[in-house]
Curated annotation (Swiss-Prot):
HAMAP family: 16SrRNA_methyltr_G. Keywords: Cytoplasm, Methyltransferase, rRNA processing, S-adenosyl-L-methionine, Transferase. Its EC number is 2.1.1.-. This is Ribosomal RNA small subunit methyltransferase G. The gene is rsmG. It comes from the Bacteria. One of its GO terms (cellular component) is cytosol. GO terms for molecular function: rRNA (guanine-N7-)-methyltransferase activity. It is found in: Cytoplasm. Belongs to the methyltransferase superfamily. RNA methyltransferase RsmG family. S-adenosyl-L-methionine binds at G115, F120, A171, E172, R185. Specifically methylates the N7 position of a guanine in 16S rRNA. Residues 84-109 are annotated as: Insert. The lineage of its organism: Bacteria, Pseudomonadati, Spirochaetota, Spirochaetia, Spirochaetales. Pfam families: GidB.
């Protein structure tokens, strides 16, 4: 990454970022806080990148479009899933006799970002949920490389991401059967080992949210999913200013 060019024009960066947030349909009341958090995140990326080799982009626009906006392009699917769970919790609470008991039965919504690397999509999603005021969503960023975890711990502190924890671990050794959603952008091809590893992280009835490219390129992966007898669907993602095709592959754990 050319660090001399990266974020050299904050106004330009903000323009692209804010337009992207608007095109994604994110609540405009959250734009100010979210854009501030994301700009700090990008500045920290610039500062650490030369030593930590976090991300390869040619300029600030590519960083915003191909990584920040791409990470946020699936936000509605995450958000709707948290609301579906919230509705079920509210229904269960309504059946309890004691209000205090009802409050105690509410549980956070857990999201894991497996192989998060520099924090994509986990950090943008964490910043989004904080900006939306949804503090019940908890994110775990799973990364095996110590230097990247050091960077992520710094990001957590600087951005005050109180909804986020950093787990230095291989995905295979991370907490099992814990997460409502397990997401990742890191794996190019989904094979049987990776699929099982990700499923092991999810709760029963939990879901995998996998960022993928063109639909025809994931046909081989969906054949594997069919053989495993899993329910799945593919959703098209519209990433502002990105000319490449993007999809979200959603797989449900039995």
């Amino acid at each position: 990454m050319d660090t001399d060019k990266l974020l050299s024009k904050d106004l330009l960066s903000n323009g692209i970022l804010l337009k992207g947030l608007k095109e994604l349909g994110i609540n405009e009341k959250a734009h100010n806080k979210l854009s501030k958090l994301l700009n700090i995140y990008m500045r920290e990326l610039k500062m650490f990148n030369a030593s930590f080799n976090l991300v390869k982009v040619k300029d600030d626009e590519e960083l915003i479009v191909a990584h920040i906006l791409d990470s946020l392009s699936a936000w509605r699917f995450f958000y709707n899933e948290t609301k579906n769970t919230e509705s079920k919790t509210s229904l269960n609470n309504a059946e309890t006799k004691n209000t205090n008991e009802a409050l105690l039965t509410s549980e956070p919504f857990y999201i894991a970002d497996a192989g998060t690397g520099a924090g994509f999509p986990g950090v943008p999603l964490a910043a989004l949920f904080i900006s939306l005021g949804n503090l019940d969503v908890k994110l775990s960023l799973i990364e095996r490389m110590q230097k990247r975890c050091t960077f992520l711990e710094n990001i957590k502190a600087v951005l005050q991401l109180n909804n986020t924890e950093i787990i230095e671990s291989e995905a295979e050794k991370a907490p099992q059967n814990k997460f409502d959603i397990v997401t990742c952008r890191a794996f190019h091809t989904l094979d049987k080992h990776i699929l099982q590893t990700l499923l092991n992280l999810a709760k029963p009835k939990g879901k995998l949210f996998l960022y993928k490219a063109a639909k025809e390129k994931i046909n081989e992966e969906t054949e594997l999913i069919k053989k495993e007898g899993l329910n799945y669907k593919t959703e098209k993602l519209d990433v502002p200013f990105l000319k490449k095709e993007r999809h979200l592959l959603i797989i449900e754990k039995p």
